[in-house]
């Protein structure tokens, strides 16, 4: 399973998929 803090858009270590992943990555980048 994956926790929120594990989410990543890294293809090799991808924990999340699709829109949720993209939104989370944008949130991190904007911080």
Swiss-Prot record:
Q: What are the annotated disulfide bridges?
A: 2-16, 9-21, 15-25
Give tissue specificity per the record. Answer: Expressed by the venom gland.
Q: What else is known?
A: The primary structure of this mature peptide is identical to that of kappa-theraphotoxin-Gr2a (GsMTx-2) from Grammostola rosea (AC P60273). Is the most abundant peptide in the venom.
Function comment: Potent and specific blocker of Kv4.2/KCND2 (IC(50)=34 nM) and Kv4.3/KCND3 (IC(50)=71 nM) potassium channels. Acts by altering the gating properties of these channels.
* Positions of modified residues (Methionine amide): 31
Q: What is known of its domains?
A: The presence of a 'disulfide through disulfide knot' structurally defines this protein as a knottin.
Q: Name one GO cellular component term.
A: extracellular region
Name of protein: Kappa-theraphotoxin-Ps1b
Please give the family membership noted in the entry. Belongs to the neurotoxin 30 (phrixotoxin) family.
* Location of this chain's protein in the cell: Secreted
The entry lists its GO molecular-function terms as: ion channel inhibitor activity; potassium channel regulator activity; toxin activity
Query: Which InterPro entries does the entry mention?
Result: Huwentoxin-1
Q: Which SUPFAM superfamilies match?
A: omega toxin-like
Alphabetically sorted, this entry's keywords are: Amidation, Disulfide bond, Ion channel impairing toxin, Knottin, Neurotoxin, Potassium channel impairing toxin, Secreted, Toxin, Voltage-gated potassium channel impairing toxin
């Amino acid at each position: 399973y994956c926790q929120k803090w594990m989410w990543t858009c890294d293809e090799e270590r991808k924990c999340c998929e699709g829109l949720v992943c993209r939104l989370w990555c944008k949130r991190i980048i904007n911080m």
